[in-house]
Amino acid sequence: MISLMEARNLRKERTGVVLSNKMEKTITVAAKFKEKHPIYGKFVSKTKKYHAHDEKNECNVGDTVRIMETRPLSKTKRWRLVEIIERAK
């Protein structure tokens, strides 16, 4: 059986760029990843958008951030801000 601390460390993490911070305590993060095409075998770049919880409203558009999966916080929010890796210039 997995202990509570081990389960917390198994949560998914993503790194991405903040696209929007216009909502109260919420940011929109675009995470890029590469996926292999099932037929042709070529690696294709894809982007997925996540809504993440930003408790202190500290992110700005263009910041590079790390987000972590969490319990559902609203209809669309299932991620929370862990840290700001790099500020936008």
Curated annotation (Swiss-Prot):
Entry-linked Pfam families: Ribosomal_S17 (PF00366)
GO cellular component, one term: cytosolic small ribosomal subunit
Keyword RNA-binding: yes
Molecular function GO terms recorded: rRNA binding; structural constituent of ribosome
Disulphide-bridged cysteine pairs: none
GO biological process: translation
Annotated CDD domains: Ribosomal_uS17
Alphabetically ordered keywords of this record: Ribonucleoprotein, Ribosomal protein, RNA-binding, rRNA-binding
SUPFAM superfamilies for the chain: Nucleic acid-binding proteins (SSF50249)
Family affiliation: Belongs to the universal ribosomal protein uS17 family.
Subunit structure: Part of the 30S ribosomal subunit.
Functional note: One of the primary rRNA binding proteins, it binds specifically to the 5'-end of 16S ribosomal RNA.
Name the record gives this protein: Small ribosomal subunit protein uS17
Name of the coding gene: rpsQ
